[in-house]
Amino acid sequence: MAAGLFGLSARRLLAAAATRGLPAARVRWESSFSRTVVAPSAVARKRLPEPTTQWQEDLDPEDENLYEKNPDSHGYDKDPVLDVWNMRLVFFFGVSIILVLGSTFVAYLPDYRMKEWSRREAERLVKYREANGLPIMESNCFDPSKIQLPEDE
């Protein structure tokens, strides 16, 4: 019921907009629940054609094709010599400096999450326990004699 009223009021709104010369959107809406379709009426489709005008691009004498002057242009400068030098500088700093020095920096970063240190510490502890005749691993992580438990109540 409500969807039908919505469709009716939408059609009236589109027709009123078309008769008054207001711009109406050409929208077709279909409800997924009640299968109501709202489409612009035939009145909305009868508009006067808009006047057509010839549009022509202004040709500025400043606009020039860089590829006519320099077919190997890289887009850095209008002058071919500066264009080549700017391209060489960009690629030198981009490839040589960033990639080479960047990968060197990453390679010499400190131990991430201390993985190497924990491995060395475990090897040192295993050597100490083997030298003193202790088991390599114990079930107790802490010495039970040093732990103070609360009294039973």
From Swiss-Prot:
Keywords in alphabetical order, please: Electron transport, Membrane, Mitochondrion, Mitochondrion inner membrane, Respiratory chain, Transit peptide, Transmembrane, Transmembrane helix, Transport
- Where is this gene product found? Mitochondrion inner membrane
**Which cellular component, as a GO term, is one annotated location?**
respiratory chain complex I
Q: Where is the transit peptide?
A: 1-29
Q: Which InterPro entries match?
A: NADH_UbQ_OxRdtase_ESSS_su
Q: How does it sit in the membrane?
A: Single-pass membrane protein
Transmembrane intervals: 89-109
Repeat in keyword set:
no
According to the record, the residues making up region (Disordered) are 49-72
Q: Relate the assembly described in the record.
A: Complex I is composed of 45 different subunits. Interacts with BCAP31.
Q: What family name appears in the similarity comment? A: Belongs to the complex I NDUFB11 subunit family.
Supply the name of the protein. NADH dehydrogenase [ubiquinone] 1 beta subcomplex subunit 11, mitochondrial
